[in-house]
Amino acid sequence: MKNNLRYGIRKHKLGAASVFLGTMIVIGMGQDKEAAASEQKTTTVEENGNSATDNKVSETQTTTTNVNTIDETQSYSATATEQPSNATQVTTEEAPKAVQAPQTAQPANVETVKEEVVKEEANPQVKETTQSQDNSGDQRQVDLTPKKATQNQVAETQVEVAQPRTALESKPRVTRSTDVAEAKEASDAKVETGTDVTSKVTVEDESKIEAPKGNNVQPHEGQRVVLKYKLKFQDGLKTGDYFDFTLSNNVNTHGVATTRKVPDIKNGSLVMAKGQVLDNGRIRYTFTDYIKDKVNVTANLEINLFIDPKTVQSNGQQTITSKLNGKETSGTMQITYKDGVKNQYTNVNGSIETFDKEKNKFTHVAYIKPINGNNSDSVTVTGMLTQGSNENGTQPNVKIYEYVGVENGLPQSVYANTVDSTQLKDVTNQMGDKLKVQNNGSYSLNFDKLDKTYVIHYTGDYLNGTSEVNFRTQLTGYPENRYKTYYYYNNGYTLTWDNGLVLYSNKANGDGKYGPIVDSNNFEFSEDSGNGSISGQYDAKQIIETEENQDNTPLDIDYHTAIDGEGGYVDGYIETIEETDSSAIDIDYHTAVDSEAGHVGGYTESSEESNPIDFEESTHENSKHHADVVEYEEDTNPGGGQVTTESNLVEFDEESTKGIVTGAVSDHTTVEDTKEYTTESNLIELVDELPEEHGQAQGPVEEITENNHHISHSGLGTENGHGNYGVIEEIEENSHVDIKSELGYEGGQNSGNQSFEEDTEEDKPKYEQGGNIIDIDFDSVPQIHGFNKHNEIIEEDTNKDKPNYQFGGHNSVDFEEDTLPKVSGQNEGQQTIEEDTTPPTPPTPEVPSEPGTPTPPTPEVPSEPGKPTPPTPEVPAEPGKPVPPAKEEPKKPSKPVEQGKVVTPVIEINEKVKAVAPTKQKQAKKSELPETGGEESTNKGMLFGGLFSILGLALLRRNKKNHKA
């Protein structure tokens, strides 16, 4: 073979290879450019909703950090379903965007899917991750979060609920871990079923049952007994825990009210425990959420108890008991009922049986009874509402019963068991037209001869919104006389019995007419801060006003009788109406006999189961009980006073002010001014605003603004201090010394007399005052704060003369610092502070050197242009020792990305990493891909490939010429 031919073959091969290789380079560089554009695109979501995109290939470390920033803030995961088309379609409920990802789940594709998930963050919702139940293919769960974020969130629980669904619902849903955790917490926040803590309640020996007016109780005068419990609870009470106690069956807590409920125990407007009336005389109090973290809980419980007319039907002694945790508290009382009004022929008595303010209805029982066999002729009994009548109301229901029991067997308590046929016989139908009932609430009943005992049961309504209700039972008749003589017609008589209900609502003292009735359910406790410490106390005894749902009008019941139309009153009371909606009822009885005037006293006390609370609570969190802790105490005893009229319309309108002086700062105390707003139910609302304090002391007291309170701020934090309490005076921060120089902001606290001196290369005079000179050098101190007390002389000397500054103050604090952000010290003597600097130079940080020796500045190596360099924090060292700046290798920040004309640098921070962007307006996110930064290298590669191809073509062409030759 010829040499030239062999050479041509080699050139042919070389030329063809060059053309092929160059073409592949050109094509490959173009494909590489597209891959770089999609692979490195990550989105950093800022708190303001804007995003910064970084596409620089070389900045992989920063890109990873930014992705982790997103993951640590909001972590997402999705379930991907494999489809037969070998592609996974990932969508979210918020936006119908789809991203095609291969089954192999390459890292670049994971990043792409992750970006879409982050973009959908605008309206995150908790969704159920479900798995298909059809035959569309197997499923697997793909975690789309980077590994670092997954490691940081191992503790988070991914909750997935599997439910059947159709093939149309094959799209996987994205579930946010944090939202699932919140939903789980919400589901766990169920109402805790409490436990019976009755066994954890101790009844103190001071507990008792007593009557306010001695041991003789007259229920018809509105008198009642009071259960006074002094209880102590073990620690660890929880929401829902309850305790029970049982009352004897001869008393109840409601009186004539229809509602069977005891009032709640309140702390102001906060319900500490809810009261409930159970069967068989059991009372239960269930603690609410406010009992949490309360320790040393004690309760002084006072509850009004009313004599039950059904159980106690006659006069005599009664033993009233209450049993709690096996301990019985008891009291023995003499019960005495009123006899009503009577003459030698007939007796009339009556009572309000029930009163329902919600339905505006009441029931009344009246006795009509001949005395000693003395019958009467032509007797007419009428019942009517003289006040509170509803003209457009419905007809009342009136039942007439004949008493068929033993003689004198009617209950003295004026109680009618209408279902007991052995005692009462219903004769309503036998009366026929003798009984007439009107729509205005009145009735009339005629007897030709009254020779039997009758019980009249009345059920009617009264006018809604009326302020007073008075029901009158009146009997007129003539003594039985066989001969109708002149004496007979002039010897008629009239008996009148009024049951008056005075509905009143006031903001004063709800005392009954016998004086104060205080239901002080004092609730005392200490506050547990949760870390085992108990600090401070809030000591307040409150009597709280309870509001009624529809009508907060308590009731006062009066009874009036008159004979022969003559004047005069015999005053008395029979019952008190008690309702849980703060409506108490007082019952008055007034009678008069044969024109004899007089006033026999006896007024009903109106009361309500007010459940005031006495409690102690922490007002200073995590504070030790020093002189700066102020304790508050409130008064539980309401002021007295009442206004009465003959109509027994009792309206109390007063504001009694009481002050209690209790513990305080060493030489001043606080006075808690409590205004008591009460209703008849003795419920007093105390409005207490803790932030307001009042001072009072024996000596002169001045308002305290800042009590030797010093606050120093610096980069390292805040220091607070309290001086000793001496003479309390108003102090303002008037001794603040600031020293400004080229090195930054400097301040100091010094005691005694000080002088500050700064020397340069030139000799300067030195100023010294006092002894115990302490040299303090300030060299490259970024920031020092402080306050100076007493007199200070501050001088700063440079190349030019500087004036001297003098400041007045009180105490002294000095600082000795060197290359430290903040160091504090304190000295008692006089100090001299020297500060050495070098001649004026550009403001660049200096390398610390020995005190007094000027050191030339060390130039700082600038970072690459266009790349921001994060500041290097200085490391604190011991005072007075220079510390060279720590050598820290600067981290490469991300290259700023152009967004319009705004450059958004992304800086990595050691703490929770977030993208840091300059202040700017919100911009719409651009959809096109930004510049990737790899264009220059790509163009060079393409140029190289092109040249390579041209060279190959030239070789091929030359080879052809050789063949021709």
Curated annotation (Swiss-Prot):
InterPro entries: Adhesin_Fg-bd_dom_2, Adhesion_dom_sf, Fibrogen-bd_dom1, Fibron_repeat-bd, LPXTG_anchor, SDR_Ig, YSIRK_signal_dom. Residues 515-837 are annotated as: Fibronectin-binding. It holds the Pfam family Big_8. GO terms for biological process: cell adhesion. A motif (YSIRK-G/S signaling motif) lies at residues 7-18. Residues 839-885 have a biased composition (Pro residues). Residues 112-122, 179-193, 794-803 have a biased composition (Basic and acidic residues). Its main location: secreted. GO terms for cellular component: extracellular region. WR repeats lie at residues 840-853, 854-867, 868-881, 882-895. PROSITE patterns: GRAM_POS_ANCHORING (PS50847). Disulfide bonds: none annotated. Residues 748-839 are annotated as: 4 X approximate tandem repeats. Residues 1-36 form the signal peptide. A motif (LPXTG sorting signal) lies at residues 929-933. Residues 840-895 are annotated as: 4 X tandem repeats, Pro-rich (WR). B- repeats lie at residues 548-577, 578-607. Residues 194-514 are annotated as: Fibrinogen/elastin/tropoelastin-binding. Residues 933-965 form a propeptide. It comes from the Bacteria. Residues 37-206, 598-625, 743-774, 794-903, 916-942 are annotated as: Disordered. Residues 59-74 have a biased composition (Low complexity). Promotes bacterial attachment to multiple substrates, such as fibronectin (Fn), fibrinogen (Fg), elastin peptides and tropoelastin. This confers to S.aureus the ability to invade endothelial cells. Promotes adherence to and aggregation of activated platelets. This is Fibronectin-binding protein A. The gene is fnbA.
